[in-house]
Amino acid sequence: MPIYKTDKKRDGLFLYTVRVNYTDKNGKAHGLTRTAVGAEAAKLLESQLTAEYKTGQITPAERMTVGELAAKYLAAKRTEVRRSTAEKTERILNRYVLPTMQKERLDRLNAQKLQDWKQSVTALALAPKTQKNIYGEFRTMLNFAVKMEHLPRNPLLTVGNFKDTDFTPPTDKLQYYTSDEFLRYKAAALADAETKGTLSEYAYYVFFCIAYYMGMRKGEINALRWSDINGGLLTVRRSVTQKVKGESAVETLPKNKTSYRTIEIPEPLMEILAEYKKRLAARDAYRDNYRVCGGGENGVLTDSNVDRHNRRYADMAGLKHIRVHDFRHSHASLLANEGINIQEIARRLGHAKIEMTWNTYAHLYPRESERSLSVLNKVK
């Protein structure tokens, strides 16, 4: 069972392929090839595959069930993606796919059975985006079965994805604060922090200022250390997830390769950070390796407390409530409305693909429509 080191990297570690060759009961030769990130993960995967082979857990395609496939798929995925990502996939499969499909044999999957499954999910009256996420996870798992030669093709592609029954204009979906609204929100947050007079309350004010001025993800802000700030530059090197089973908060790598980024800090935020640093130092609560908002080496602001403060600040400012992630939208929307190049916005957000940025914020470029009309009006 060989391990091969490739020349590709992910999150700074080399990718390895692990292969096991075996013969089924009919004498047909098969090969399973899986990928692991890093040498340690590759050795662990090799041990796992060896154990499965010796105990007969490697099941020929004609007898493998969806449940058995899910177990193998999740085991492989845990070696390739962040822990929180693997657990999200596991939750979706356990909740929406396996209850009705786990006993179905792969070789007996057909369009009717999969259409019945789709109808059962539709009956749950979930949001269209949630339905499509469920379909995507199931489709990816069956693609894995094709890759591992358990299926000749993916039968789910025949029935297709869920469709939107109603059309909602993008502007109705995207929630954000304008610059004027954020200034009201910011003033309310500062007033609340000053009234309570504690560093921990001031940290929430700083948290939302970073979210708006930098467009960073919630986990990236929680993982931010003072050593990540160098003059007018801030480098995103890590993230924190609070949705890992059995643990309150886990520091992880950023979401993707482009999430590693160095971005410029605007002057208003520089002043806020300088004042916060001054207050921390006055109480001997500042160290270079301390987290900016959570304090200490491993402190975090919990999701529930961040949400609670967010609602309070919005109420105090007389504003509609938006989600914490919508501060990231607010950052991008402000830049888009000012005509900033979409590629620059994608860079600041750390998007893996510029198409993601364009599809989300393209409608916020009103000046482009004015410019195009102006050009056409000259042709007369």
Regions found by a protein language model. Name each.
Residues 124, 187-201, 214, 263, ...:
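Short, basic (Lys/Arg/His-rich) helix/loop patches that form interaction surfaces
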Residues 187, 191-194, 242-245, 249-260, ...:
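C-terminal secondary-structure termini that scaffold catalytic or DNA-interacting sites
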Residues 132, 147-153, 157-218, 222-224, ...:
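Basic, Lys/Arg- and aromatic-enriched nucleic-acid-binding interface segment
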